[in-house]
Design a protein with these regions (language model features):
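Conserved helix-loop functional segments at active or binding sites
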Residues: 283, 287, 297, 314, ...
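Generic detector of multi-pass transmembrane helix bundles and their immediately adjacent loops
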Residues: 292, 305-308, 320-480
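Short aromatic-rich membrane-water interface segments that cap or initiate transmembrane helices
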Residues: 272, 311-322
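Membrane-embedded alpha-helical signal segments
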Residues: 1-288, 292, 302, 306, ...
Length: 480
């Protein structure tokens, strides 16, 4: 039987040089040892596996079952029982050593090599006073970072494998009593129904299970911060962790989630309220400003003060393009510059961004391709987009920015209003895993008190009821 298994393995792996086959005899009982040398720790193999087998050879008595003796005498190593050939392949490709014992008994012993990096500072979601740890590519480490913060038995996780070839481990985390079970069950059903060659990152999985495929707005959040995940779980959200991916999915979400930062928890509620208002203002500026400028200079000049209109006209006197193409050219140039900024090493990207923007803007004005006021409009729009906490929302709204520009260049301010109606209608029609994307703004709900305006912590003593049925007090105190 063992010979058939080994021959089948050699055939399927094309007799790979990385798969090592060894034999060991204990009182004339043959043990076949199989492992993948690129995934297993050779020190553990020497110190635990081979040394333990040598010790077992000395103490073994024939009346005992060798299978049980091995399980009882190899310590400090996770041991799994193997029931079929598929288990052998799974454990072999996960850094386990396979022991094929006569009489059809088989064991898998975990001796995997540590191929992951250590816990580091967050790279994409920096905070001033937040936690300084981030997720890694190891799912056990990531779950540990969460459980270290949530010391409760009510933190439940359900594991599954996804991908015909990658067989990635996926863990779905919820807090019993807080999370809406319908959302969790819906996600699990979608994951179970997926038939795909492999999933290697959170972005791919997000698009596979999203309900809203006809909107450019994200209906889930990707994060690398354990503290952000814990805050979301305490609010009744569901979290998906993927092995070999340092980012975690949070769902469902509402539009307000894209304007919240972990630094908000450390700020005074008055200061933080002003900051949140500033973020929403920046959101409005980055979406509307180019379109309004184009509408005013193209169709509705009477709405501009005379001195300002004269200044605009003198600046644009040598520009051969309409305001729409002028703005579009600058935004395309900015997007190209930003994309190149992402693709080059960190030591060079800041210099390239600054020098590129200065040279490009000055050269464009001197050449008469764009006006100085357009450079200012594009700069304000781009800087305002950076204020938005979640970059996924910034990427989504740039398409609506172009629509507002088209509306402004065709029928002026009236076109801006038409696109605005389309924009708000689209937002109100989106749902994130069964929850309204625009809650608590539409419909208006009492939970709005922790959206744009942040109330004192003791006034925010209930959870969002559109996320969970358990709205018991989160924080309270008794006055003496």
């Amino acid at each position: 039987m063992n010979t058939k298994i080994i021959n089948k393995l050699k055939e399927e792996t094309n007799n790979s040089s990385y798969i090592v086959y060894r034999e060991k005899y204990i009182n004339n009982i043959k043990i076949d040892i199989i492992y993948n040398e690129v995934l297993t720790d050779q020190d553990k193999m020497s110190n635990f596996i081979y040394r333990s087998l040598d010790h077992i050879e000395k103490i073994y008595q024939e009346k005992e079952l060798l299978y049980d003796v091995i399980k009882n005498n190899i310590s400090n190593i996770k041991i799994k029982e193997i029931n079929n050939y598929q288990d052998i392949c799974k454990y072999l490709n996960n850094g386990f050593v396979i022991l094929l014992i006569e009489d059809d008994y088989s064991l898998a012993l975990e001796v995997k090599k540590n191929l992951t990096r250590s816990i580091e500072k967050p790279m994409t979601e920096t905070t001033i006073r937040g936690a300084m740890d981030s997720f890694t590519e190891n799912i056990e480490t990531n779950i540990g970072l969460i459980k270290r913060r949530l010391k409760t038995n009510k933190l439940w996780n359900e594991d599954m494998e996804l991908g015909k070839y990658t067989k990635n481990k996926i863990s779905i985390l919820t807090i019993k009593g807080l999370t809406d079970s319908k959302i969790k069950d819906n996600i699990i059903n979608k994951l179970n129904s997926l038939e795909i060659d492999g999933v290697t990152d959170a972005g791919t999985l997000k698009h596979l299970i999203e309900n809203e495929t006809k909107t450019i707005f994200p209906t889930s959040i990707t994060t690398e911060r354990p503290d952000k995940v814990v805050s979301s779980l305490l609010r009744g959200k569901t979290v998906i962790i993927i092995d070999n991916c340092p980012f975690v999915l949070i769902m469902p979400v509402d539009i307000n989630d894209f304007f919240l930062s972990q630094d908000d928890k450390d700020s005074n509620y008055i200061n933080n309220s002003l900051t949140r208002i500033l973020r929403y203002l920046a959101f409005s500026i980055t979406v509307l400003t180019p379109g309004i400028y184009i509408a005013l200079t193209t169709f509705n000049q009477e709405m501009i003060p005379l001195e300002l209109l004269t200044s605009f006209a003198s600046q644009r006197s040598n520009v051969p393009f309409p305001a729409f193409f002028e703005a579009l050219l600058m935004f395309i140039s900015f997007e190209i510059l930003r994309e190149s900024d992402y693709r080059i090493p960190n030591v060079s990207n800041s210099a390239l961004s600054i020098v590129g923007a200065l040279i490009l803007g000055e050269a464009a004005v001197n050449a008469g391709i764009v006006s100085p006021i357009m450079i200012i409009i594009v700069a304000i729009t781009a800087i305002s987009a950076l204020v938005i906490v979640e970059p996924e929302l910034s990427n989504a709204i740039k398409w609506y920015r172009i629509l507002f520009m088209l509306g402004g260049t065709t029928i002026g301010i009236f076109g801006i209003f038409i696109v605005f109606i389309i924009f708000t209608t689209n937002l109100c029609s989106i749902n994130s895993y069964g929850k309204a994307f625009t809650m608590p703004f539409t419909p208006i709900d009492s939970d709005i008190k922790n959206s744009i305006i942040k109330f004192p912590l003791l006034k925010r003593n209930k959870r969002n009821k559109y996320l969970t049925n358990n709205i018991i007090r989160e924080v309270s105190y008794e006055k003496n």
